[in-house]
Amino acid sequence: MRPMSVGRLAALASTALLVRPGGSMRHPVSRLRMRALAVGLALAASALVPSGSAGAADQYEWAALGDSYTAGGFVGDPQPPLGDASRDGCDRTTHAYPGVVEGELEEFPPGKYVHLTNVSCGNATIADIADTKQTPISPVQPPAGGWPAVDPQIQRAKLNDQTDVVTIGVGGNSLRFGGMLLKCLELGATPGKSCREYYTSPPEGEESIKDKLARVQDEYIGMLAKVHQAAPNAKVITVGYPAVLPEEGSACNRLALTELGAIKHADIDWLRDDVLKPLNSTIQRVTDFFGDRYVDVYFSSVGHDACQPAGTKWVEGICGDAAGYWPAKLPGTLLNCAVIHKRVTLVHPNAEGHANTAAHVERAIRIALLQH
């Protein structure tokens, strides 16, 4: 196994209290219990499938599923490279956490190595993991007719009884968190209704935040059930979202596009406490119910949000620093980050943010493989 630096070992050790094993549900929710029981027979049937070997004799099989917070988007080099015929519009990159973790898991334990199949895709929803074909929307050198649809990630990853570990980072797009940020940005630039008011008492045709979270919970239950059915012998690890918003909305510089732009301070506080934290809690609650492992990357990233200065932030703001191939304008909107010599980053982790997530996910995978 490749030697690790003292700093790397310390970083891994510091995650011990942040990665919780699966277990009983801390806050029982009747609907969650009813839905999970509904899929229980299917999972029980999966358990009766004869167990195969842990994988090929010389390797463990790890599948990484998820959205842009897993794929990377603008962090590092595109993977596959620009110009490669196999590019699929999913914006996976070399410095996103799956690739970072893969490099750290070379020959672990001695005599075996971890083989990564990364099928994460920008803009993926929970449904895109398990059920539906996704049409990628990468703005980077799209083909003339647009990107062709890709199969559900469970299918793309070819999950089976030889899969040892599955990591999943998804949920934000099903909640439509990115769209909520843009709506909050729009409402913040004009007097009138706040973002909180808009989503707690929404207009006709718009879901309330309460309904959004309930729907995400139901979708997550169904998705995890299908992952277990597809990979009955795998250790399943879910990954939450980092602290992209500050602990105090007033910490943000209003109108600074490198932070959260025109979003009102009170709405930032609402987005943090009533949207982002409940989303993570929902993911953790469902994960615990299935007996899987949840990786918390929120706590360790507090103080490194989008409103921190460069060098401290682990999340870029509405506009931010990104690789040269990434666009400075957001198609279909008036957002133009070129005016401040930045690129459109829409509150996504930078390389430091992915490195933090990688340390936590790496430790969770090591534990999972030792228990396999």
Regions found by a protein language model. Give the residues of each.
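Charged, often glycine-rich, active-site loop that binds/positions anionic groups
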Residues: 120-150, 305-322
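Mobile gating loops/cap/lid regions near enzyme active sites that modulate substrate access
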Residues: 246-277, 284-347
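Conserved N-terminal glycine/acidic-rich loop preference
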Residues: 165-168, 192-227, 237, 241-280, ...
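Serine-esterase "nucleophile elbow" of acetyl-processing enzymes
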Residues: 56-123, 185-192
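Short amphipathic alpha-helices and their capping/turn segments at secondary-structure boundaries
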Residues: 53-64, 148-167, 221-235, 362
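Oxyanion-hole/transition-state-stabilizing segment in secreted/luminal serine hydrolases
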Residues: 73-77, 128-211, 243-246, 341
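Secretory targeting and sorting signals
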Residues: 2-56
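Structural recognition of the beta-strand scaffold that forms the well-ordered cores
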Residues: 61-73, 115-120, 164-169, 174-176, ...
